[in-house]
Amino acid sequence: MIRDTINALRAAAGHEIVGWLAPGLTETLDTPDLLAEAGIRYCADWVVDDLPCEMRTAHGTLLTMPYSVELNDIPIMMIQHHRAEELFHRTVAQFDRLYAEAETQGAKVMGLAVHPYISGVPHRIGWLEKALGHMAARPGTLFWQGRQIMDWYLRATA
């Protein structure tokens, strides 16, 4: 199933697939080994830390990419039934904390999981735009995809 998924994504994207995020963060204890065996280099299913971490597998190292269920519009709005501004407040609070910590501890990574059918609708999109604007206004803030974060981390730790 993993290889079939990777092949379908590669065909659609037109480039090699190096990252993985399972639906609903679901996996088994064998999944990291299977992902590494299939050529996946990072996985966002492990909700740990604010920097990538290295996980040893039977087929080499697999990076775990920072991901947060606390900054995910599905639990916030669809399960906990909060209004859209809750995602804004949580995003800004987490960003401000990580930004302050980065001044003395070095770079931080913050994942923000939003879905077009939830946060992208007209009555919610303004709150997302406001959060993104807050972050973009701070010097040194970068908006990267997982592949870019992986490349940066591997260079920084080489």
List where the protein language model places each region.
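C-terminal domain-boundary segment and adjacent tail
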Residues: Y42, V92-A158
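A structural signal for the main folded, soluble domain(s) of proteins
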Residues: I2-D4, A8, A12, V109-L112, ...
